[in-house]
């Protein structure tokens, strides 16, 4: 298909033109849309968000094209989404092929985004209109440009530069003499061009201006003529009228491929071309490689059509296709569009520690789909993954982002975007906090016994050191330090008095220490008389006051009380007033001769109270009391609830716990999660002391749950009950463009537009309020919200000046009000009455009998005008005509029109002494009556003159013509003679001699032909003359011919299981006998084959062919004069 050349390119053929001057450097020819000299080009003016729009380009085939645009980031609320389109909707992306490269860059200093589209090795299929679309939240803008693809360019004179040669062997460009012999071979071409140039210059207009005029619109002729100084406008127009665009028609193709096709992935597509000769060989190519028939690519021949069917299109089929017939080719490009990829399982918020392994996964609807990961609005690519310690993984429909060793800077908001949806989640990375699961306890041991300090921390990998009175403890024969899992032990064998002191365990890398005291119980041997009263030696560490001990719930408590006396006393323990004697269980007593121990394996709140030990012997008794106080983590907070929500925040309120664990509550910790998720996210890391907290950074429209922990010196409580699910939503923005539509003496009609931002909460309606000027009290005009963007406020005081405002209402509450800038005076404005007569009623309005008459005529005027209809000065007949009048229009209605409804109707609209009138002319028509007095006036030869008179009833419409028919008296079959005959007479010719004819006439008007015709009262008799016929003698022609195939059999490739047909056409007389054969074996009465012969068109239908049916088929036709044979090959392919 020939391509149109730009005018600038033809202008370079002048005598003094440079040989390789590019088209854009031709100063005499600006483009068609070039602005006047006093204006700057529109492409350089910043329009909307574009600082520089993409320019239309013209590229030679096989070269690269670059399109550049710049976007003002100051006009955008965030990072823009950039899309390129070919045509109107065909989106270009990573699936468009490797030839399309998209680049984006951002200059942070000037806040300018630069976008580029690179098209490599341009082909003819790239020609067309393109569109660039920029979108950022609610801001969207687009602009279009064109890419024109040309054939490779020669030098400016139309000849190859190789025509100029230099004689000699010198390598220098100036060596030797110029040899112009190459030009002599194309002298005729040069002379033709000179002659053409002379013809173009006969008006003194350069050829490039003619090319510009040929491509311009007619409305731009005068502007171009004025711009280039052309004064002979009449001659210029005559010349343009004579100029004809020669379109070179294709010799091989009668219908070519479209420039581009688009198909969804998984579907099939048919590429159809039509060739001029069905016998021409045809080949299909994909990216330059010939396509062979297969189950994927199916070739079909239907007449002159050649069809390529591509089944189950994949992204590999996204390519350039061409079809070649002899030396001619046509091209197209196929774009395979992926279905929208939906997000099935979104990302979930995660809270991890530094060094942990993190996997953020999302599940999409399509396997192998492309997704884009973003962190804090910046795209994450595989190229950057080597520097940033992350990697991507695909597992079927799941896409996973993996951090093997997460760092604190990896925290942030992560987003996954597909072409059908997006989701986001937050990753919080915090420093590891070591949790003490079991603290070390104070010990009291005797000499030569073993002392064991044991603690448990949350991290198995944490190491630490033991200190005694600030000095590090080193292992020795008596001292053993061990670390097994989360447990750390310090074991001291054969305890000595110098081992007494404060022992501390300090984990490495944490500002944490665990301390306990080792008390050495020294046994002194003294001389005691044989009888000594019992004595209690009470010395327990951990007491806060005299005889008071504090223990943490869950820890072990052992009270070793030394007793003396002679004879050895008996010890009794009491809890409150009850004697405690258990020797086994969680709480029990251990008795030794010189010591009585009270042991609690795991302290509970119920163990708190006063404990008494009483020792007795015959000499006396001794009593000591100990108050045990058990401290614990507090109870969970109560009455946790969300009191209010916003666009991305919520207010959380709770009550302090009833039981504080024996220690004052120091603060609270909060957590939240999305409803349905199992992952809780910490909101605060430092304790929060108040009971009201504002949680932020939530996603509007997502359901959340929250819970609260209480914290005291002992630890963190159990979580509270979850709040009811809540959704962060915000009121809408203020309604827009509030205006006054109408004002009367007591009402005001307002209208507005919906808010710019509605949000996830939607909008339930609008509330209208008004306030008298000078007052600050706003009065609601409607109790229930109105859904439409308009409202009439009624019962207003006449003459008052009132301000109005409108607020949007949704589940989150009221929006900001939209208020009128000026107060409105409540007084109706008198407007002169005016009838707005529709255009079709300004002329006679014609309807047919029986049809409905429904006329709607709008008018204006305030207050409501008085409307009066009359016909000929008299009131209308209300039994036939219905009239309905509103504030803005009047309706004239007749259910079934009759001819009596025709006439002139007057409509008047009056307000006080002001009046406007209009006249409506109505004509009701029907079919006309038959023609009158149809007579045959004269007969001569085979002609007859018929005349008639117009019908008495014209159906209230002009007679537009007559319909004339004739009939032979013998058969009385009527035949048409004339249609739309305008006159009341006609001459009927070519009548048959010897016959007698009748004639009938139908009248015709706007409704059609009359129901009955007017029939001629007399007949036209065509008499015979005395001419005798002498037949000529001739030799009878011999019509017998031998069989000959007009259309031969064609080789076929069919798909197994689908019925196939072999067709050919044969001619012969007498009618030849036809025999079908397969592999030279005659096909008999086989139900698999159906043979038909319709007027020489022979068809062999093969029902559901299989590979066994493949072979050579032949058709043999023979009669007494000879025979003919046609053969073809049938190939049956099995779908893969």
From Swiss-Prot:
GO annotations of cellular component type: cytoskeleton; myosin filament
Matching SMART domains: FN3 (SM00060), IG (SM00409), IGc2 (SM00408)
Job of this protein: Thick filament-associated protein located in the crossbridge region of vertebrate striated muscle a bands. In vitro it binds MHC, F-actin and native thin filaments, and modifies the activity of actin-activated myosin ATPase. It may modulate muscle contraction or may play a more structural role.
Gene: Mybpc2
The Ig-like C2-type domain, residue ranges: 46-149, 250-339, 340-432, 433-533, 534-633, 833-927, 1043-1136
Keywords: Actin-binding, Cell adhesion, Immunoglobulin domain, Muscle protein, Repeat, Thick filament
UniProt record similarity statement: Belongs to the immunoglobulin superfamily. MyBP family.
Upper classification of the organism: Eukaryota, Metazoa, Chordata, Craniata, Vertebrata
Alphabetical list of PROSITE patterns matching this protein: FN3, IG_LIKE
SUPFAM superfamilies xref list: Fibronectin type III, Immunoglobulin
Listed PANTHER family: MYOSIN-BINDING PROTEIN C, FAST-TYPE, TITIN
Protein's name according to its UniProt entry: Myosin-binding protein C, fast-type
Sample GO molecular function, one term: actin binding
Spans through the membrane: none
GO biological process: cell adhesion; muscle contraction
Domain Fibronectin type-III: residue ranges: 636-732, 734-829, 930-1025
Regions of compositional bias (Basic and acidic residues) in chain numbering: 13-35, 163-174
Region of interest (Disordered), ranges: 1-55, 151-177
């Amino acid at each position: 298909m020939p391509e149109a050349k730009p005018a600038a390119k033809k202008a370079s053929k002048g005598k003094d033109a440079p040989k390789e001057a590019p088209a854009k450097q031709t100063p005499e020819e600006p483009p068609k849309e070039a602005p006047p000299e006093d204006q700057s080009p529109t492409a350089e003016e910043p329009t909307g968000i574009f600082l520089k729009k993409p320019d239309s380009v013209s590229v030679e085939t096989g070269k690269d094209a670059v399109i550049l645009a710049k976007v003002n980031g100051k006009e955008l609320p965030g990072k823009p989404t950039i899309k390129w389109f070919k045509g109107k909707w065909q989106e270009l992306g990573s699936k468009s092929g490797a030839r399309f490269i998209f680049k984006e860059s951002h200059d942070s200093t000037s806040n300018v985004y630069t976008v580029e589209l690179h098209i490599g090795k341009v082909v003819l299929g790239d020609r067309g209109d393109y569109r660039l679309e920029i979108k950022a939240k609610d801001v969207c803008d687009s602009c279009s440009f064109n890419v024109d693809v040309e054939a490779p360019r020669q030098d400016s004179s139309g000849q190859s530069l190789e025509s100029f040669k230099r004689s000699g062997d010198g390598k220098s460009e100036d060596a030797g003499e110029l040899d112009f012999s190459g030009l002599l071979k194309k002298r005729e071409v040069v002379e033709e061009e000179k002659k053409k140039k002379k013809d173009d210059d006969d008006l003194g207009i350069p050829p490039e201006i003619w090319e510009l005029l040929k491509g311009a619109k007619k409305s731009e002729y005068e502007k171009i003529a004025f711009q280039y100084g052309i004064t002979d406008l009449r001659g210029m127009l005559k010349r343009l009228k004579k100029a004809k665009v020669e379109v070179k028609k294709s010799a091989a193709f009668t219908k070519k491929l479209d420039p581009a096709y688009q198909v969804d992935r998984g579907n099939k597509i048919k590429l159809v071309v039509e060739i001029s000769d069905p016998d021409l060989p045809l080949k299909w190519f994909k990216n330059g490689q010939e396509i062979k028939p297969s189950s994927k690519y199916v070739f079909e021949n239907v007449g002159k059509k050649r069809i390529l069917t591509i089944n189950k299109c994949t992204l590999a089929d996204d390519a350039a296709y061409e079809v070649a017939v002899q030396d001619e080719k046509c091209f197209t490009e196929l774009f395979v569009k992926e279905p929208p990829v939906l997000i099935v399982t979104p990302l979930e918020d995660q809270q991890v520690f530094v060094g942990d392994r993190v996997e953020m996964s999302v599940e999409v609807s399509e396997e192998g789909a492309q997704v884009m990961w973003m962190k804090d609005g910046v795209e994450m690519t595989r190229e950057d993954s080597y520097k940033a310690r992350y990697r991507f993984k695909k597992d079927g429909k799941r896409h996973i982002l993996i951090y093997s060793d997460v760092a604190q800077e990896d925290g942030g908001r992560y987003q996954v975007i597909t072409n059908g949806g997006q989701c986001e989640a937050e990753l919080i990375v915090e420093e590891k906090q070591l949790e003490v699961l079991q603290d070390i306890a104070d010990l009291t041991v005797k000499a030569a016994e073993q002392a064991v300090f044991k603690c448990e921390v949350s991290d198995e990998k944490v190491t630490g050191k033991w200190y005694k009175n600030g000095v590090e403890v080193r292992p020795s024969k008596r001292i053993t330090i061990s670390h097994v899992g989360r447990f750390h032990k310090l074991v001291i064998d054969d305890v000595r008095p110098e081992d007494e002191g404060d022992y501390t365990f300090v984990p490495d890398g944490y500002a944490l220490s665990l301390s306990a005291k080792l008390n050495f119980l020294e046994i002194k041997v003294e001389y005691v008389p044989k009888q000594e009263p019992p004595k209690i030696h009470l010395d327990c560490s951990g007491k806060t006051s005299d005889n008071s001990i504090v223990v943490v719930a869950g820890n072990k408590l052992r009270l070793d009380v030394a007793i003396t006396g002679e004879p050895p006393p008996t010890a009794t323990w009491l809890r409150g007033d009850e004697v405690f004697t258990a020797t086994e269980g969680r709480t029990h007593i251990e008795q030794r001769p010189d010591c009585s121990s009270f042991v609690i394996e795991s302290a509970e709140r119920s163990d708190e109270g006063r404990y008494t030990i009483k020792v007795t012997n015959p000499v006396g008794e001794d009593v000591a009391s100990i108050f045990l106080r058990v401290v614990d983590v507090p109870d969970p907070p109560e009455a946790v609830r969300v009191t209010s929500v916003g666009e991305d925040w919520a207010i959380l309120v709770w009550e302090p716990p009833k039981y504080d664990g024996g220690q004052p509550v120091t603060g609270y910790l909060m957590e939240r999660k999305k409803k349905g998720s199992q992952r809780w996210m910490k909101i605060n890391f430092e304790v929060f002391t108040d009971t009201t907290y504002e949680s932020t950074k939530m996603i509007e429209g997502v359901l959340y749950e929250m819970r609260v922990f209480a914290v005291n010196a002992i630890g963190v409580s159990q979580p509270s009950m979850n709040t009811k699910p809540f959704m962060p939503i915000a009121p809408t923005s203020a309604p827009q463009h509030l205006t006054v539509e109408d004002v009367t003496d007591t009402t005001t009609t307002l209208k507005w537009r919906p808010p710019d931002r509605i949000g996830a909460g939607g909008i339930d309606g609008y509330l209208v309020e008004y306030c008298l000027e000078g007052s600050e009290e706003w009065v609601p005009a409607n109790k229930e919200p109105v859904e439409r963007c308009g409202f009439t406020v009624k019962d207003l005081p006449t003459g008052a000046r009132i301000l109005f405002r409108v607020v949007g209402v949704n589940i989150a509450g009221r929006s900001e009000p939209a208020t009128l800038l000026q107060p409105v005076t409540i007084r109706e404005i008198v407007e002169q009455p005016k009838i707005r007569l529709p255009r079709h009623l300004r002329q006679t309005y014609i309807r047919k009998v029986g049809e409905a008459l429904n006329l709607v005529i709008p008018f204006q005027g305030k207050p409501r005008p008085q409307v009066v209809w009359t016909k000929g000065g008299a009131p209308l007949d209300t039994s036939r005509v219905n009239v309905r009048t509103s504030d803005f229009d009047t309706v004239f209605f007749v259910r079934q029109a009759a001819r009596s409804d025709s006439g002139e109707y007057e409509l008047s609209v009056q307000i006080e002494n002001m009046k406007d009138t209009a006249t409506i002319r109505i004509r009701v028509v029907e079919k006309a009556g038959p023609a009158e007095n149809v007579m045959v006036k004269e007969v001569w030869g085979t002609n007859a003159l018929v005349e008639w008179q117009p019908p008495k009833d014209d159906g209230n419409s002009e007679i537009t013509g007559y319909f004339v028919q004739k009939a032979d008296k013998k058969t009385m079959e009527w035949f048409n003679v004339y249609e739309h005959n305008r006159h009341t007479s006609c001459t009927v010719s070519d009548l048959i001699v010897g016959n007698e004819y009748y004639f009938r006439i139908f009248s015709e008007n706007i409704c059609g032909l009359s129901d009955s015709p007017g029939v001629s009262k007399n007949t036209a008799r065509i008499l015979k003359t005395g001419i005798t016929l002498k037949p000529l003698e001739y030799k009878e022609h011999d019509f017998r011919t031998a069989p000959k195939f007009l259309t031969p059999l064609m080789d076929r490739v069919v798909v197994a299981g689908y019925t196939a047909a072999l067709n050919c056409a044969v001619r012969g007389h007498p009618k030849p006998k036809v025999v079908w054969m397969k592999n030279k074996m005659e096909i008999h009465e086989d139900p698999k084959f159906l043979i038909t012969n319709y007027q020489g068109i022979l068809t062999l239908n093969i029902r559901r062919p299989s590979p066994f049916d493949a072979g050579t088929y032949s058709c043999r036709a023979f009669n007494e004069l000879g025979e003919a044979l046609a053969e073809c090959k049938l190939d049956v392919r099995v779908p893969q």
